[in-house]
Structure formats: C-alpha cells, structure tokens
A protein has these predicted regions:
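Phosphate/pyrophosphate-binding active-site segments
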Residues: 2-23, 161, 314-404, 522-560
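Active-site diphosphate/adenylate-binding microenvironment
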Residues: 29-33, 37-39, 47-60, 365-448, ...
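N-terminal alpha/beta PP-like core and its mobile active-site loop of ThDP/TPP-dependent enzymes
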Residues: 2-353, 393-396, 476-479, 515
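Thiamine diphosphate
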Residues: 128-138, 328-330, 336-338, 345-346, ...
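Short acidic loop-to-helix transition motifs that present clustered carboxylates
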Residues: 52, 72-77, 407-409, 527-531
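Beta-strand->loop->alpha-helix junctions that form or flank phosphate-binding loops
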Residues: 69-70, 257-263, 405, 525-528, ...
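Generic enzyme active-site microenvironment
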Residues: 183, 320, 401, 454-455
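Hydrophobic "anchor" residues on beta-strands that sit immediately upstream
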Residues: 231, 399, 452-453
Length: 560
C-alpha cells in the first residue's frame, strides 16, 4: 500500500517555473510530445495526416527525434523493431481513418511478438464522435473497434487535461509484461485547441512486475531437481526479459539440454554442449522433446511453429513460465506459472538443487547429428552456402531483420544469432514487408552499428518506398533482396499440395537500378561472392542494397 509519506509531492524549482510560465501558443499536440518526453521517449515514428497535424506541429517545439516513413504500416514495423531492440515503448504517430487502419498489420505483428509500440492516432473533431455519420473526412463509426482485437489496451481522450494521464497509462500498459502495442486516440480539435495547462514535467508510468508465486516455483524446482531427463524450451520471453544469463545458469545447474524457439534466437549459446539450437521443425528434435520427463518451457506459448505444427505431444510433465496469462496451458496442460521469465528463472535458481548428467551433452550431439544427416540427404548445398555467407558477413553484434522468405525460414532453424536480441523476424503474425522498415527502426535506435534486412522480391515490393526514408535519414541499413521471381515459399507450398503453383510468379523491377534511383548504392551478387559483397555493403556508411538472384528451396517438412 502506498501512504502519503512515501510520495514526493512538492514540485522542484524548475517545475514550478515551467508551470507558472508556460510558453505561449501551446496546444493539445504540445501536451502529447511533452508527455512523451517526460516518460523518457527520445524517438518517434509516424506519418502526418490532416487530423493529426497538431501533434506533428508540436514536434518542432520538442527535443524528440522524428523518423517519418512513407507508409503507416512500415512506420509501425519500424516502431516495432525500435521497441524490440531497446526494450522501450516506441511512439507511433498516426492520423485518422485510412492512416490508422494502414497500421493494423504492423500492430498485429507487434502484438504477436510482444513489441512495446505506443500508437497515438487522431480522431475526427469531438462533435463528430458517437457512432453517427456526420460526413467528416476519414470518419469511422467506431475507430477503436478496429484496434481492440489487436492491441493490449485502448485509451480515449476527449479533453486536453486527459492527454498526459491517458498516454502515461498506455505507456505503462505497453511495458508491463508481456510487452505489446497500445492505442491512444485524440480528436483533431483537442490536438489543435490552445491550452493554458502547465508544461508537462513530471510523469511516472512504471510498468508492473509479473512476479511468480513462490509455491509454484517451489514445485517446479523440485520437479527439475528430481527429473531424469529434463529439457528446456526457451522462447522470446527469455530474450525480452533479458534473462539469457539466468537461462544458461539454470541449464548448467541441472544439465538440461536447451532448444530455442524462433522468437528466442540467441537466448542460449548456439555451440554450447547443451544446445539443441533451433531445429524445432525437425522430427528428431520433436522426438527428443517428447521423451523428456520434465519439460520446462520459458517465455513461449508453444504455438504452431514452436510445436512442429502442433505435432509435438509431450509425454512428461510440462512446466510453463509465461507472462501472457492467455497463453498459459493454452496448448499443453501442465504447471503454469504466470510470471516474467527473468523473475521466474531467478526464483528457480535460488531453489533448484544441482543435478549432474554426463550423458546430456552426448544426447544433444546425437540429435544434432541426426538433424544434420537429414538435411545433408536433401541436396541443399546452395541454401546452406547462402545462409553461411550471410552469417560470415554480418558482425556479431549487428541486428538482423528477416521478412517472410525462404532464406528466413532457413534462418529460423539454422542461423546462429550469436547474441541475444539480435535476430528478429515477422514470424509472430507472418505478414510480408517487415524486414526493411523494421531494420530502419533498429538503425534509428543505434546508428553506431550496421543493421541487416533480408527480403524476397515479393516482400521487398511491400516496402520499396522506404528506400527514400533510408536515404533521407542516412540510416545504416543493408538490404539483402533474394530475387527468385515470385513468392517462393508459396510456390513450394502450392506445388507440393496441388502439383503446380498459381498466382506466385511476379514481374519485378531491376532492384539495383531502382535502389540507385533513390540514391542508394546497390550491388548484384552471386552465391559465390555474397559474403564479400554483403560484408562490403555492411561496412559502408548509410543505406545499401545487395540483390541475390537465386532460386532457393526449403528442407523437407517432418510434420506431414
């Protein structure tokens, strides 16, 4: 309980001065940017529109850095990536109606991947709200309804004095585990109206901790300590909570093999003797996981991709640690612990007993050898060569962002991320066009290291306009486009299912010439020269494009 004596209510001298002498000409938009600054934001993403101009005008009177993209969906992807790599809430400023709706696919990805995006959209003037049809430009009967199924929370403003508290509440919601996108909407007239309210100088929106119940972690520790064949599945929650070190400590304490989900890439060292890497779409890995007598799942809901397309059927006891309450036991019954991964792992480390199993590393080697033999039998040398070239060219600490393309599907299973929180993809919601705008968002967060984006030619066309953004802000992003003349993965799916593919072949531009028309240097490469060309592009300042004409294939599935 909070008591009066715990609070510091007296303003500082600077706060009093700012409150009593606010600058002239401030409006509701100023309250928005002042609140964001007070909460600690430094960078905002977005795209202006008529109803939102009050917010955008206020940006020039603030210290916020604005990164404007060419399409709202891409601005949302950029904010998503900024939130992933920094762990901070990423403000996304949008206009009403079409502008707001264009962001929905990006917000769905942010929700699926637990990325903290603070979307602030405008509305028609307050007089036009209420569900009727007044004929305002961009008008929707219920704009919020379009967002409620996607975001964590919706926050409505109708008066200027509500702006700071509404944004603070949204900020707290976005950053309370599980992280996720939130929606705030403010009418046009509220944003434009002059305000006599004092400058916003003191904001507090501390996210709430999701603490494990001790009786649950006590039982979990006992099960792990006495297990004969414990195994750990590490998901994206481990990465988001910065718990990779604690995960490794626990695995080594009980000699438990660890496999990372595609969202958990980098959570556990790839070459560690206990590392099963990320081969979740391989039946050898699935069989090994099913044989565990105690399976600890940390920060994963064991969804479609993490369960080898729902063919995974554990025979032992499942312990699931998950910050998203709706995911607890949603796919497999077991001991569900609603908690942040870092806090739960800390509790387990304090209570679990040491357990030694010299055979664990041997078992891991056997599984990986079986996986390797299966892949080697499929004549997929080109695909492995291309992926190895990307890994060789990319600095260990550089983030990479992967679109929904065949090379990304390979990377989910076979790419060594080397560091936590460096490999990201759109595998949460699975929409096209994520890679390049997301990489721009990560580069805006840290310009000191190069960022890699990987797309196919089909996905690249979703975000080609953002070459202008990359050039305008001189962001250090290298975009690798694998050009196979169509939607390659869908071509494979349809050919396997129906004998031939339909609607998958594409007439695409000359990506090298197109990039150069934006003032972005571009190179056409080959599998043999990819490593050298990609490393050279990553080493140069500013944006660049590398185009690889290649027809890649997927490894055979094991879930059919």
């Amino acid at each position: 309980m909070t008591h009066d004596h715990d609070l510091v209510l007296r303003p500082t001298v600077a706060q009093t001065e700012a409150a009593l002498n606010p600058p002239k000409g401030r409006n509701g938009g100023d309250l928005v940017v002042e609140t964001l600054q007070g909460l600690g934001a430094t960078t905002v993403f977005g795209l202006p529109g008529q109803h939102a101009l009050g917010m955008f005008d206020a940006l020039r009177r603030s210290a916020l850095t604005y990164v404007g993209l060419r399409v709202e969906n891409n601005a949302g992807f950029a904010a998503d990536a900024y939130g992933r790599v920094t762990g901070e809430a990423a403000p996304l400023l949008l206009s009403t109606g079409p502008g707001a709706l264009m962001s929905l696919a990006a917000l769905q990805e942010a929700a699926a991947a637990s990325a903290p995006v603070l979307a602030i959209g405008s509305q028609v003037p307050a007089a036009g709200l209420g569900g009727g049809r007044h004929g305002y430009l961009h008008e929707l009967r219920d704009q919020q309804a379009s967002f409620r199924d996607i975001v964590k929370s919706v926050h409505t403003v109708r008066k200027a004095s509500q702006i700071p508290s509404a944004i603070a509440a949204a900020w707290q919601s976005a950053l309370t585990a599980p992280h996720g996108p939130v929606w705030v909407e403010i009418p046009q007239d509220v944003l434009l109206a002059e305000t006599a309210l004092p400058v916003v100088t003191a904001m507090d929106a501390t996210p709430e901790d999701v603490v494990p119940r001790p009786e649950l972690t006590d039982v979990a520790a006992h099960l792990l300590s006495t297990a004969e064949r414990p195994v750990i599945i590490a998901g994206g929650g481990v990465v988001r909570s910065d718990a990779s070190g604690k995960l490794r400590a626990l695995a080594e304490k009980i000699d438990a093999p660890v496999v990372t989900t595609f969202g958990g890439k980098g959570a556990f060292p790839w070459e560690h003797p206990l590392s099963l890497q990320s081969w979740l779409e391989d039946r050898h890995t699935t069989n090994f996981l099913e044989s565990a007598d105690v399976l600890l799942v940390v920060g994963s809901g064991l969804g479609e991709l993490s369960s080898n397309y729902y063919t995974f059927a554990p025979r032992g006891c499942v312990i699931q640690i998950e910050a998203d309450l709706g995911k607890l036991e949603s796919n497999h019954a077991g001991l569900g612990i609603h908690a942040d991964a870092r806090l739960a792992l800390s509790a387990l480390l304090e209570t679990v007993e040491d357990r030694r199993d010299p055979s664990a590393a041997d078992a891991v080697r056997e599984v990986l050898a079986a996986v390797r033999a299966r892949i080697d039998s499929q004549e997929l040398t080109l695909e492995q060569q291309v992926l190895a070239s990307v890994r060789e060219a990319l600095p260990d600490d550089s983030p990479s962002f992967w679109d929904m393309t065949i090379l990304a599907y390979w990377a989910w299973s076979a790419f060594d991320a080397r560091r936590p929180n460096t490999m990201h993809s759109a595998q949460g919601a699975g929409g096209l066009g994520y890679g390049f705008p997301a990489a721009l968002g990560a580069a805006a967060a840290d310009r000191t290291r190069p960022v890699l984006a990987v797309s196919g030619d089909g996905g690249a066309m979703y975000s080609i306009a953002e070459l202008a953004t990359a050039r305008q802000y001189d962001l250090p992003v290298t975009w690798l486009i694998v050009d196979d003349g169509g939607y390659g993965i869908l071509r494979e799916y349809m050919t396997d299912a129906f004998g031939e593919a339909t609607a998958t072949e594409l007439a695409c531009p000359d990506f090298v010439a197109l990039a150069e028309s934006f003032g972005v240097p571009a190179t056409r490469t080959s599998p043999e020269t990819l490593s050298e060309d990609l490393a050279k592009a990553l080493a140069q300042p500013g944006p660049s494009v590398v185009v690889l004409p290649a027809l890649l294939r997927m490894f055979a599935p094991t879930h059919l």
